[in-house]
Amino acid sequence: MVLSPTDKSNVKAAWEKVGAHAGDYGAEALERMFLSFPTTKTYFPHFDLSHGSTQVKGHGKKVADALTNAVLHVDDMPSALSALSDLHAHKLRVDPVNFKLLRHCLLVTLACHHPAEFTPAVHASLDKFMASVSTVLTSKYR
């Protein structure tokens, strides 16, 4: 999916608002995903999945850091996310549908925390961006 210059600008501006809260939002999105889509828990059998879990917070930070890296390298996400794509495709073997579920939960989380900034245009840009990230992460499944 090709991001327009406006999409890139919207994504960068939205991610600046996320700022230091990125790890917390990542953890909240994971909690939403585990509650809304319980089958996603199967990839985390060794985690304490309770609210406020240190393990969920740690993984939420990893998710947020990966998205921050994608924002910083929006024009070359395949290179920036190559190692992460390898990990998910070859070692973890995460079902690609789970990226879509997490993307939805991330968008809901961002909308809850930044309702004024979460305009329809920003929503569309973030959705396109996260779809692009998902495409990159699943590219090595083939």
UniProtKB/Swiss-Prot annotation:
GO terms for cellular component: blood microparticle; haptoglobin-hemoglobin complex; hemoglobin complex. Heterotetramer of two alpha chains and two beta chains. GO terms for molecular function: haptoglobin binding; heme binding; iron ion binding; organic acid binding; oxygen binding; oxygen carrier activity; peroxidase activity. Involved in oxygen transport from the lung to the various peripheral tissues. CDD domains: Hb-alpha-like. Residues 2-142 form the Globin domain. GO terms for biological process: hydrogen peroxide catabolic process. This is Hemoglobin subunit alpha-B. The keyword Heme applies.
